[in-house]
Amino acid sequence: MDNSVRVRVPATSANLGPGYDCIGLALDLWDEVSVGVLDRPGVMIDVTGEGADTVPHDESHLVMATLRQGLVELGYPHPDAGLHLTAINSIPQSRGLGSSAAAVVSGLALAWGLARPGFPLDRSALLTMAAAIEGHPDNAAPAILGGAQLAWLDGEAVNHIGLTVNPSIVFRVYVPDRLVPTALARQVLPEQVDRVDAVHQVLAASLLVTALTTSPEHLLAATQDWIHQPYRRALMPESAALTDRLRGRGVATVISGAGPTVLALGSRDQLEKVSDVDTAGFVAHDLVLGEGVHFF
């Protein structure tokens, strides 16, 4: 029995405008997490990087809690064993870059490594488990499978289709200092939307798949949103203003996930041409698509 496991899990950006709760992509920004079995009960948790001073250092830590749940579900003979968790975090937390999905996915992958040593990850099983915990698969699917994913729930089953992103498309995230809890970003959404807005949303979401894969010249139109970003503007005015500035320059730009990070996507030339846009209060990262969670 192998008593230590290490995994890398990517940041993810969900929604991409109109693909609310169903489209997401993995980016090459990583958390590296390892676990070792102790010869005594209890837990040790060491965190460096993002969240080091804010995340809990006990059993309530999301990676640890998910790891414990995964050990039980996978039939590990000692699910209450003492564990030493080490996390080196590069994914900003509560910024709309899938930090909670990364924690859930890394916990489940670590559990798999302990319970099934030597066996490759069953990504389908991990996705089912992660979606059950998260409640929606838009971040979990790319975190596990990598690349861009269209994912949806059918009862308890998770379906997904990988999207082959046009190689000309690159990504830039603008990460602000401020946080916006996902729960708060969901609370401001209306229970119902106008039918005209719904029709526009369906059109844009359909166009988004084509724009991402074969026709990137349509990305600006394909990333327009009517059902969630307008209602969240008041929670993240700086992010909304930056999105407006970049879109006004012709660059496809959205709020990443529940925000407040801003995601711009297009060709390298397009992104270089907006390097002069005022981004005070944000840190920019140029990224490409990432692979899914993996042992290393």
From Swiss-Prot:
It catalyses: L-homoserine + ATP = O-phospho-L-homoserine + ADP + H(+). Its EC number is 2.7.1.39. One of its GO terms (molecular function) is homoserine kinase activity. One of its GO terms (biological process) is threonine biosynthetic process. Keywords: Amino-acid biosynthesis, ATP-binding, Cytoplasm, Kinase, Nucleotide-binding, Threonine biosynthesis, Transferase. It comes from the Bacteria. Belongs to the GHMP kinase family. Homoserine kinase subfamily. This is Homoserine kinase. It comes from Cutibacterium acnes (strain DSM 16379 / KPA171202). The gene is thrB.
